[in-house]
Amino acid sequence: MMKKLPLGVSLAVFGLSGSALSLGQVPDLVNALDAGGRTMGAGGAFYATDANTYSALSNPANLGFINSSQFGIAFRNLPTSRQRVTGSFTNRTFNGEEFFGKRAITHVGYATPVATGTIGLSFTTGGYLRNQQAGTGLANGQLRVDNYFEETISQTDFFTISYGRNSGQTNYGFGIVVANQYIKNESNLTIVDPQTNQTVGTQQSNVSGNGTGLGAVVGISHTPVNNPDLNVSFSLRTPISLEGNTSTEAIYDRVPGKATLGLAMRTDGRFGSDDFMVYGFQADYYFGGQSNRVIPRKNHLVLGGGLEYNLFKFDARWPIRFGVQMAPSGGAGFDERNALTFGLGYRPYSNKYAVDLNFASPTGGGPVDMSLGITYAVGGVK
């Protein structure tokens, strides 16, 4: 007689894997998802040094450069990875492929000057994972696992309120960050006796939930007196421990912190009297995660470099961007996700809006990521 058993019982009775989740080499965007701003097209090289609505989270010090109110929004794809599972159930072999995934709003922000500086409010998606696994005919001792399917989703959203102040050559900023972490793990399988080809049991599990936590972000931005075309910036976001996530804490229970160092350099008049080029480099060090969770996190360094050439033609400024991003594995079961990036912006003269279209092509294969960002000067043209 077929039995439908809960996860823990079926794993024990039939001697299956002791973990509800087993990841293959999944491209790692759990912490390092680019929210899709202007900087995405330049390898993520300008988040620490740029001044826009993203600064509330990435570096609140640069809010101090904003002298008129602005609104920003970004849309991008959220990649999905799918893996075909072969071999035995307790020693699985994964053959993976990445897909474009769904489209979503990944940033909404507002910045406005106040008496002594600038306040920024933002929603930003900073991490994403959606991995699906499927296989059948997986040997497991004297039994066989058929119709195996498992899906794991992780999404980290940050809600931030920050303040930045322009103090001459050096800006300072700080903010409060609320993290909302969504986790889902769903799995189904059938246990079969290969001698009789009869189903002897099934296992179904569906665990999901949200956890929230409170953290902080601080930043500093410096422009040397003797080199006004250079900016050096640093920001630090604390690790965030999650609360209210009893059902999913074994899967993921702490959002790693991030220390960021960024440099940007401007040069003028390369190919035209008004044109200028901006070069950038950024290093993001993720730290303070937990290695003993189902989605493990270790300390790791993500690097980005790129350039933006600003062309003045047809009554508009056209930023053209190229870059590279190197994102190594952030934990066991994950793979690097490096990318070549490019993008185009549009800044019409005497208008309040700006548009940015950016792309990132993973070097390991898969569809090209795409983002659309729009900025609107609420308080007038800067």
Region annotations inferred by a language model:
Residues 2-3, 15, 75, 81, ...:
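Short, intrinsically disordered low-complexity segments
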Residues 18-125:
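N-terminal, post-signal peptide beta-strand-biased segments of exported outer-membrane/organellar beta-barrel
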Residues 13-14, 69, 170:
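Alpha-helical transmembrane segments and their juxtamembrane interfaces
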Residues 23-40, 104-382:
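Outer-membrane beta-barrel porins/channels
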Residues 2-22:
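Gram-negative bacterial Sec-dependent N-terminal signal peptides
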Residues 2-3, 58, 307:
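Residue-level micro-sites within transmembrane alpha helices that shape
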